[in-house]
């Protein structure tokens, strides 16, 4: 009875106690979620106070995870409509603080997906805002819900295999397709005649989808990047083939995917599905762009790099002593970043020594810095990086950490499963005295002074990501090395890993080549971008400032603009020097080809600028600046579309061609569009053209003349404004052209051919005259030869003598005094017998009066009949009887 009474008294007491405990348990079970929601609302409110496009009264929706994109890889994320617009509200997706999305993203409202393909210029973090609005009573859009998430675009890492970089939806597939650490990756690349910078994000994604349907390769395995420095083909390729494109018009795009690991010509998979369609045009018809060619090459295995780690600070207690263990930890809730968090305290002169603290999670390989100062070993929390702490540590404040490079060694610590590892870009200067320069103070650490480690308190917020750029930052923070050389090893010479080999350039076309980071490798300074590069000639001479090839050692960019005198092969040497003074050399050739279009360009652009042409012609930097400005005026980001033809006097007369125009048939519409873009119909430059070239070049007039397939057309200036496309352009060019292009055509097509024909006729006439005169100086005929006996001595016949002259007087002797006396005359009888007279009767009668009266005198010998003296002809011939007439016949 007493016991039953006691039970009756205890039952109400136990009931009340049980109800109290149950209510407390229920309160405890609901408390964390309420606190989480309250903390989340506080963070969202802090974000809404900063973002201009979101109102403070708009409730936030959590559920869109942050995304990661890689340059050249397709990105796709689906927006959950049940969380944003469950009641059919209007959804708006844009960049935070802007009205539109980033240039590489495309929003598809039908499938509620956000997709795109980033390029190298899109690297960084992009914050995307997704908001739902409803049409209000007054016609305005009233915000209902909103959400903000981030997309970080990582750069393309050439040293990492493609299978690892591929953003595959199945991680197991990525691991299974990955190659070994020392095994090269075989990649097939298709070269397209396309310009990714001119495509919209949807066009890039559609191109990948068409290639997927053609080649049956998944999107996450394909990579699409633009051509850099006109390097269309890979010199290390072991297989290659042509496409259907005869020439390259655009900048070019490379679409590639992985074939396997360490393949060669013997074990490469069947590529007939690429080889024949690329050559015959089937692939081009499917993709919508011309195919230039394809090649297969093996990519070298990656070089191990440091992995930057990010510690998720959590209040979870862990054991400070003993090896790291794996602790079960829920991933922290996503925190929307705000400019108000974290708070950075002002710097002071205190320094925090390295501390150690095991972080729970999956073990991974990280890097620990060994300094020159020996610290006292202590047991405490493990901190994997050296933290430069300023001021007193206050819970809730996050200090930016700075990684100090030095001698590193791997240590096994644990990181959370949700940790995102990132590769920092840090410089590695020479070992020096450890110092940390802040904006106001300089702190030096005493040598070998034991210091009690100060534990860094944990906070519940996410530490920001700190990037250390190699270029000089705007702040005065310097990163120095406090370590010593590794084991006192001597400095090793840099090694040449990949040759530059050959660089192709064209006359009048600007080119630039970025030296790849895997060209040289140094054991101390690592990749090529950490070395000092110098471009030299054969005789160890540096390239001069006036050379047509220039090299920027800071950006490691080689560029130039050759002219017609540089056609051929030129040998140069690239010297890579490490910080210890040791260097390696790579010899390569620059092949300069003739103009890509030659004289077949369909149009020639001429512009007249004010100034002296001599400084422009003699300064390679001014010529390159002119080409870049001309390309910018046409809206081309690729300067190789402009081919500089000539720079002459007459102020500054510049003539160039546009390589984007097809040669045949005549691209009349395209030329007219380009002409109207830069000049008016009367040849006056437009404001956009002038603004693009000023202040260095001030244009006064522009002329566009057809050539090649359009040689009969004149575009700028034109007589009437041509508004109807079907009008045929007039071939009668007015004389208002400042550069007198019409007169040049007249000289080229009329005057010069006429002069050439006249010269040919004149030369032919001179040759005919010479031949005629030589023919007249030939041998005499037989009749003419019988007329003369001796050359130059005339023959006088008897009937040609002049008998009218009187005979000579007998008083003048016929024999001169200096001559010898003749022989005595013969004895003649005294009788005169007519028949013995040696002369004829006429002669005796003629000379009879000349005889002496003395009968005993000898008979007179008459002189020869030629009595007239021969003036200037020398002596007479002695025997002339054969040419005299015979004496008359006298009968006996």
From Swiss-Prot:
Residue ranges that the UniProt entry lists as topological domain Extracellular: 28-750
Residue numbers spanned by region Required for binding DMD and UTRN: 877-892
Residues in the signal sequence: 1-27
Positions of transmembrane segments: 751-771
Residue span, Peptidase S72 domain: 600-709
Gene Ontology biological-process annotations: axon guidance; basement membrane organization; branching involved in salivary gland morphogenesis; commissural neuron axon guidance; epithelial tube branching involved in lung morphogenesis; heart morphogenesis; membrane protein ectodomain proteolysis; microtubule anchoring
Function: The dystroglycan complex is involved in a number of processes including laminin and basement membrane assembly, sarcolemmal stability, cell survival, peripheral nerve myelination, nodal structure, cell migration, and epithelial polarization.
UniProt subunit comment: Monomer. Heterodimer of alpha- and beta-dystroglycan subunits which are the central components of the dystrophin-glycoprotein complex. This complex then can form a dystrophin-associated glycoprotein complex (DGC) which is composed of three subcomplexes: a cytoplasmic complex comprised of DMD (or UTRN), DTNA and a number of syntrophins, such as SNTB1, SNTB2, SNTG1 and SNTG2, the transmembrane dystroglycan complex, and the sarcoglycan-sarcospan complex. Interacts (via the N-terminal of alphaDAG1) with LARGE1; the interaction enhances laminin binding. Interacts with SGCD.
Protein name per Swiss-Prot or TrEMBL: Dystroglycan 1
Source organism: Canis lupus familiaris
The encoding gene: DAG1
